[in-house]
Amino acid sequence: MNRYINYINNIEINISSYCNKLTSNNKFIFYFYRIVTSAADWWMYLIYAILLLLITDYNKAINMIILGSLAYFFHYPIYYIIKNITKRKRPFEREENNIKCFVKPPDKYSMPSGHTSGITITILTIIHYFEGTNIFLILPILIALSRIFLGVHYPSDTIIGFLLGCTCYYIASLILT
């Protein structure tokens, strides 16, 4: 079992290091992922809520905000419990010579990715209320990639973040339906 975990860990380090080197060597990748990752910064959710109130039916906007807020209500305690149980160091801390940090991380530990889980909740809420918006599922993928390329998460951190976002959204939607 330990051998298997080491094998997976080495794959993650290699992927993270490779992506990070691409970011170091290519200004387009650097700026692209810096912009992408900011779409999941905490303050953007306030902007999304205000935009909803301005561009869509008031009742629909309120229902979306309630659904998203309930999902976040479940999300944050689980997120912090996972962070504090795993206490996984961020890639740039574990691999100081191979991986650079290109953004300021919002907290100390790596697992799970809060940017990925948060944007997943937001996008699933949008898809729930607006038909034909499945294309927006690309955003959690781009956010996840940005966190890897910018040196603050391993691939498994973003996968767990995505699953956490899906789970919290699902629980909230079950409660409200």
Which residues are covered by each model-predicted region?
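N-terminal transmembrane-helix/juxtamembrane module of multi-pass inner/ER membrane proteins
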Residues: 1-44, 79-102
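Membrane-helix interface segments
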Residues: 26-29, 59-63, 92, 130-135, ...
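Alpha-helical transmembrane spans of integral membrane proteins, capturing the lipid-embedded, hydrophobic core
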Residues: 46, 68, 72-76, 162, ...
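Interfacial segments of alpha-helical transmembrane regions
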Residues: 51-78
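Membrane-water interface at transmembrane helix exits
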Residues: 53, 78-87, 127, 169-177
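Transmembrane helix-loop junctions in multipass membrane proteins, especially transporters and channels
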Residues: 57, 84-92, 151-156, 177
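Membrane-embedded catalytic cores of phosphoryl/pyrophosphoryl-handling enzymes
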Residues: 96-177
